Amino acid sequence: MRFAVLLLPLMLASPALAVPPLPGPEDIVAEHARQVDSARMKRTVQKLVSFGTRHTLSSQTDKRRGIGAALKWMEREFKRTGLETFQVCDGATGRRIPVTTLICDVVAIQHGTERPNDVVIITGHIDSRVSDPMDFTRDAPGANDDGSGTAAVLEAARVLAKRKFPGTIVYAALSGEEQGLYGGKILAEYATTQKWNVVANLNNDIIGNSCGSDGVCDAKAVRVFSEGPRWQGREDLAPRIRSLGGENDSPSRNLSRFLARLAERVGPPVNLDVRQIWRNDRFGRGGDHTEFLNAGFPAVRFTVAVENYNYQHQDLRLENGIEYGDTIDKMDFGYLTGVTQLNVAALAWLASAPPPPEAIAEGAVSTDTTVTWKPVAGVNSYRIHKRRTDSTNWAPDPDVAVVTCEDKPCPPELKTVLKGIRVDDWVFGVSSVSKDGYESPVASAVPGGAFKPYVAPPPTTP
């Protein structure tokens, strides 16, 4: 078996011989993003608000008011896209659920044509609340929290449902978030039971306002939160990360880097910068992506650049001249459209790209570094990445190494030696590249860097 290690050349096309290029991956996903309809999203949020309250403990049988009516409407809207649609439910009780209550998520699946078990999931929570998390009778419009994320999920399904992708996309409206992230846990457990290879969970929670409660406005950026050292397997991973690195290289952190780079590469219509926030979530707050992390899946949270706390978890009221409550008139639908466009571009790209490989880097007491990885089924091209240990993002080197199998299939293990590059000074990673140019997120060659649930190695025999 032969494989070639190449250096990417800097190529210049002669103007005299130039021909119109075929659309590249950036052009294709940008065109998908352009289909996002701001007016349609506003109508979606208006409909969600019309249910009065979507509190998890509200009526499940009333046809016009409560969580049950909202879930049934969402299910009908998903079915209109032609996708396989169903509810995943489980009973729950807890600190904010005093009696056992049925918690349901509405799920729509767009099955992949080549790799149906490789899955990217977009989520938003459909339930809402007021000041008292146990009050399920007052109106809780939940326009931004999280009608905005729910609208993004539905709009993504409307835009992408008629396209075909190698991998699978799952669209989900989750319940029970405000009562304790129950909907996220239910879907993460379902994904585990189905043995999905979840490449990414893109959780959208509060993505529809651009001005904060202090008057500061920022409509040019979206925050993406990602965990550092991965939670799963931390007891086994901790000493290995301490020795070999990986504090900043969880799959979720690399998913965040991927999203930031994607926003740059795609450009208009995605006119937002990704502000990478390197912690799992905001101080003292939580979101459904955490339950995907607990299950071992890469997950990030999208949320606005500046939050307005007067409009979150508040009874509708006017107090001391200040208006409180999460109503639709406080939203910025132009901003929501931009965040949704980034999500659509990311879903299309991730469902088109192969999953990242699992890699390791070695080079102790050597002036060279050896990077080894297991090839992904059906993928013959891989890119080696490096960055300084104190650098934020992977270096965009023009001479980055590319490994391509010259015969099919690739051997069970691929390896390349980076001459004169000392392992101590760098973090290394590997990405997979499809035949049509879609590159996966980078998987860091560190303990816990693989895009899969972590399994501790067996104990060493003395």
Predicted segments with their positions:
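N-terminal capping segment at the start of a domain
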Residues: 19-65, 311, 319-320, 324
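A non-catalytic alpha/beta surface segment that caps or lines the substrate-entry region
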Residues: 43-111
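Active-site-adjacent mobile loop/cap segments within catalytic or ligand-binding domains
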Residues: 49, 207-225, 276-354
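Alpha-helical metal-binding/catalytic segments enriched in His/Glu/Asp
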Residues: 108, 122, 127-128, 132-181, ...
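Metal-dependent peptidase/peptidase-like ectodomains
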Residues: 174-287, 295, 299
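Conserved aromatic anchor
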Residues: 367-379
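Beta-strand-rich modules
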Residues: 416-440
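Extracellular fibronectin type III
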Residues: 433-462
